[in-house]
């Protein structure tokens, strides 16, 4: 049977030591917060208060240091290497910036990743990267990122980069933002809310419908933050590709239940995260 590859996405992994912690609990993907200084430089991997219930909100690294740690965790042959860790979502906290700084934020983000993660294109980290932007008005971050990799001589690295708008906007509005940014693929669509609150699955179902339609723009759908078995089952039943969680072991347990084992498998490096799964 053709099983849907699933991404178990460790939520709020902002200290380097947490990479091991979350992957060892079953995550094959992590989400990391990125905060910016007033000049649109990515500064810290930091969430801050408030954050998910039951989590410390204050763990952080300098962004460049985190990237170096992440590179080690995703470079075959390194002592810290995890073959299982194949996708990283950067939750870009651009709310602190003016709309007209989005391009610069993308440019500076690209330079940081190029140097500290991709090692200037020389045997850098291998994980796929999703740039997750909270505000549709900040679509020029994508343009800045793409144009910088090109001008720095590494346009091929965009093959490893995907996109997400995380503001729970209407799906049509998200599609329009991608048109403006010139994005025609590599689209993950998030939907969700902090684990302190409940949220239904109606928009997730809209996103799945777009993904599975012949003219949709979405390749993968993920739901956050899912900490309970019942919610995990509901999300999987709705057909998501990824579940973001504070407890990767909980999601792993559910995926091991016979009903889900028949339909899903844990995604590996050979699963292209930009390809829509066809049953």
Swiss-Prot record:
Expressed by the venom gland. Binds 1 Mg(2+) ion per subunit. GO terms for molecular function: lyase activity; metal ion binding; phosphoric diester hydrolase activity; toxin activity. Its EC number is 4.6.1.-. Keywords: Cytolysis, Dermonecrotic toxin, Disulfide bond, Glycoprotein, Hemolysis, Lipid degradation, Lipid metabolism, Lyase, Magnesium, Metal-binding, Secreted, Toxin. Its cofactor is Mg(2+). Mg(2+) binds at residues 31, 33, 91. This is Dermonecrotic toxin LrSicTox-alphaIA1i. It comes from Loxosceles reclusa (Brown recluse spider).
């Amino acid at each position: 049977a053709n099983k849907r590859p699933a991404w178990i996405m460790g939520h709020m992994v902002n200290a380097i030591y947490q990479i091991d912690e979350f992957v060892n609990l079953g995550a094959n993907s992590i989400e990391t917060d990125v905060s910016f200084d007033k000049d649109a430089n990515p500064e810290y991997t930091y969430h801050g208060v408030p954050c998910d219930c039951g989590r410390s909100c204050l763990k952080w690294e300098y962004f460049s240091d985190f990237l170096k740690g992440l590179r080690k965790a995703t470079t075959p042959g390194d002592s810290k290497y995890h073959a299982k860790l194949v996708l990283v979502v950067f939750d870009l906290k651009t709310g602190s910036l003016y709309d007209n700084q989005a391009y610069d934020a993308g440019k500076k983000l690209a330079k940081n990743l190029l140097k500290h993660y991709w090692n200037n294109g020389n045997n850098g980290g291998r994980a796929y990267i999703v740039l997750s932007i909270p505000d549709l008005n900040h679509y020029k971050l994508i343009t800045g990122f793409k144009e910088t990799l090109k001008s720095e001589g590494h346009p091929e690295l965009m093959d490893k980069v995907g996109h997400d708008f995380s503001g729970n906007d209407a799906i049509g509005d998200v599609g329009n933002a991608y048109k403006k940014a010139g994005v025609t693929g590599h689209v993950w669509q998030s939907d969700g809310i902090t684990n302190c609150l409940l949220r239904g699955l109606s928009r997730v179902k809209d996103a799945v419908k777009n993904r599975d339609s012949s003219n949709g723009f979405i390749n993968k759908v993920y739901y956050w933050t899912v900490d309970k078995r019942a919610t995990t089952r509901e999300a999987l039943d709705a057909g998501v590709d990824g579940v973001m969680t504070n407890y990767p072991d909980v999601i792993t347990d559910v995926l091991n239940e016979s009903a889900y084992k028949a339909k899903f498998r844990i995604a590996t490096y050979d699963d292209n995260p930009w390809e829509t799964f066809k049953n």
